[in-house]
Regions:
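A common structural junction motif
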Residues: 164-169, 195-201
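Surface-exposed, charged, gly/pro-rich loop-and-adjacent secondary-structure segments at domain edges
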Residues: 80-187
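Bulky hydrophobic/aromatic content
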Residues: 1-53
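Loop-centered beta-sheet repeat module
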Residues: 39-86, 90-92
Length: 222
C-alpha cells in the first residue's frame, strides 16, 4: 500500500530508524583532491600515480595503479586496484584516507580478465586475509567450520545464519554447535573474538588459534 497521506508518511519516518550493528566510528579524513582524482580516473578508466602510506609503514611509497572499483565498508572507502609493478596482477585494497597525492595519467587502466565486482565480494574479497590461513587450501576460502557456543552466546546464530548450509546442534549440556561453510578471514576472527568466553571452541584448529591469538593444544580444548 502506498502512503499517500503526508501526515501518515511523516509519522512513519519519525518511527523508523536503522542502527549500526557495530560500534559507530568517525570517518577518517580524506584528501579531497586525491579522492576526486581517483574517482575521475576510475570513471574514465585511466591509470594513476599515487603516493600511498600502507598501514604497516610510516613513510609513503609511490605506485602506478590500475583503478578497478570503489567499495565503502563502514566509514572506510577503499579503492580496488592492481599495481603495474606486480607480475601476478593481484587485486589489492587501498584505503582512500591513506593517499597523500594522486596524479591522473593518460595511459588506460587495465582490469583483470573476467573480473566482476559482485563475484569478488561474494567470494569474500573484502574479508581481508589472516596470515595463519595461508597454510590452508585456497587460503581458507569456502571452509567448513564447527563453532561451539554457550546457549546464550549462540542464540543469535539460530536466527541469523552464517551460511545457507548452516546446521545447529543443541548438545546435552545445552551448549550449541554451529556448522557452516564460510571464508576464513580476519573479519571472521574479529567477530568471533567479540563473543569472549561465550565461544567455547572452534574448528579448524587454526581458526581457534587465530581467535585466541596463541597456539593451542588438545588439552586446552573444552
Amino acid at each position: 500500500r502506498q502512503l499517500k497521506n503526508s501526515k501518515v508518511t511523516h509519522s512513519w519516518i519519525d518511527r523508523v530508524r536503522i542502527e549500526p550493528a557495530s560500534q559507530p566510528l568517525i570517518a577518517p579524513h580524506i584528501d579531497l583532491e586525491s579522492k576526486d582524482n581517483i574517482y575521475h580516473a576510475l570513471f574514465y578508466q585511466l591509470q594513476i600515480k599515487a603516493s600511498y602510506t600502507r598501514s604497516d609503514k610510516s613513510q609513503a611509497s609511490e605506485y602506478i595503479l590500475n583503478p578497478i572499483a570503489i567499495i565503502q565498508r563502514g566509514v572506510i572507502i577503499y579503492l580496488l586496484a592492481t599495481r603495474t609493478d606486480d607480475p601476478d596482477v593481484i587485486i589489492r585494497t587501498f584505503a582512500l584516507h591513506r593517499f597523500a597525492s594522486v596524479e591522473i595519467l593518460e595511459s588506460a587502466a587495465q582490469t583483470p580478465d573476467n573480473f566482476h565486482l559482485d563475484n569478488y565480494l561474494d567470494a569474500g574479497g573484502m574479508g581481508f586475509s589472516h596470515p595463519l590461513f595461508s597454510q590452508l587450501p585456497d587460503r581458507g576460502k569456502h571452509t567448513a567450520v564447527e563453532l561451539q557456543f554457550t546457549k546464550q552466546a549462540g542464540k543469535s546464530l539460530t536466527e541469523s545464519k552464517l551460511s545457507d548450509d548452516q546446521t545447529v546442534t543443541i548438545n546435552s549440556d545445552e551448549t550449541l554447535t554451529i556448522r557452516a561453510t564460510v571464508n576464513l578471514t580476519s573479519q571472521l576472527v574479529w567477530w568471533l573474538r567479540g563473543f569472549g568466553s561465550g565461544l567455547l571452541d572452534a574448528k579448524p584448529a587454526l581458526l581457534y588459534e587465530a581467535v585466541l591469538d596463541k597456539p593451542i593444544n588438545d588439552a586446552q580444548r573444552q
